[in-house]
Amino acid sequence: MTNRELASPKRTGRPRNSGRDSANPREEILKEASRLFTAQGVAATTISQIAECVGLRQSSMYYYYKSKEEILSALMEKNRESLTLAEKLLEEDGPVAPRLYAFLYTDVRQLCTAPLDFYELEVAALAQPQVFAGFEEDGDKLRDAAAQLLALGVDSGELRQTDPAATALMLLSLNEGAQHRLWHGRRDEEKASANSAALAESVADYHLSSLLADASSLAAVREAGRAFVTEYEDDEPAA
């Protein structure tokens, strides 16, 4: 599902076509590209449109990104938060249910606040596998990590009996559907940020309420799960 280790090569020079100033031209390009992809779709967006929005000549874009596919690859790299957290949570000790809650909450929130609707990214990745070589592999790793957490929860007695692999696929598919509905209903980052945390909590609550062996423990699981999320965020390096 989420993003990948396809960083663009670092280049020097930054000729610009306007007086706009940015301490990080690459980030500015990604932000404007995401806005255009969201507004009119990936296929309809051209590299020249992105360059114009950023204030660069199209030829100058090549100092940063050589193609629209390279921009998409960089955006994909930004969507690995869920997988990174899942791998960390598998290394933790103690109750499993809060770790599963933290993973599911983070997955929904990350999908909702990513620069691009996951479905748009998936279409681009499947159409050009040579450009997005890590996309399917990361998706497999994410499902496997979710299945491992589920299996641990079943073994510990915290979760009801379930098929970990099938349930992991279902949970992640529901998360993707939830983010798509949020993306479909808005076209600006501010609205996404305002709604993503609430949606993430609702979806994680829904998942855990159906999985917990003791449904009455949901409030405690939520509190402990959110503590994991906060700890993870505090450990993240500053941008």
Name these PLM-found stretches:
Residues 28, 36-70, 74:
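Helix-turn-helix
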Residues 39-43, 93, 114, 156-157:
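Short coil/turn segments at alpha/beta junctions that flank glycine-rich nucleotide-binding fingerprints
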Residues 74, 88-117, 168-171, 200:
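Hydrophobic alpha-helical connector segments
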Residues 108-151, 158, 165-166, 193:
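Short secondary-structure transition hinges
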Residues 118-122, 162, 184, 218-221:
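Short, hydrophobic secondary-structure boundary micro-motifs
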